[in-house]
Amino acid sequence: LYATKDRKLVACGAIEQKFWSAFCNAIGLADEYANDFRAPAATCDAVAKVIAARTSDEWRPIFAAADCCTTIVVPLEEAMRDPHFVARGLFAHSVESASGKTLPALPLPIAPEFRDKPGTKKAPPPGKN
């Protein structure tokens, strides 16, 4: 995770070389840091400085255009309104806490073909599975 200029976080999951290369190109990382096996700490510091130079709103379209497994971390409330998640029904479930409060919950498994029907289920009391 890397902090942006406006203190939001960028999550980068560029594990495969093609995604790492796309990420380095997208952020304009200096070539000397692209091979993170040489000096991983220096690469991490360089990426942090580059990401910190722009706001999340500046980075969002850059990452959207690049196939680099990178995104801006958003609060739960914003994620619940994301059209992609809404279309997939990821927040169609909820649980009820021991105090009776209804909370949004991700269905498990996430793949819809393996889920029970949407609905509200009571969460077990703390310590009970």
Question: Can you say where each PLM-predicted feature lies in the sequence?
Answer:
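AMP-binding (ANL) adenylation modules
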Residues: 38, 77-78, 97-98
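Short acidic-hydrophobic surface loop/beta-edge motif
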Residues: 1-5, 92-97
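Flexible, small-/acidic-enriched active-site or ligand-binding loops
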Residues: 95-129
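Conserved PLP cofactor-binding pocket of PLP-dependent enzymes
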Residues: 64-85
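Aromatic-enriched alpha-helical interface/lid elements that frame and gate functional surfaces
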Residues: 1-70, 122
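Short, surface-exposed loop/helix-turn segments at secondary-structure junctions
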Residues: 82-96
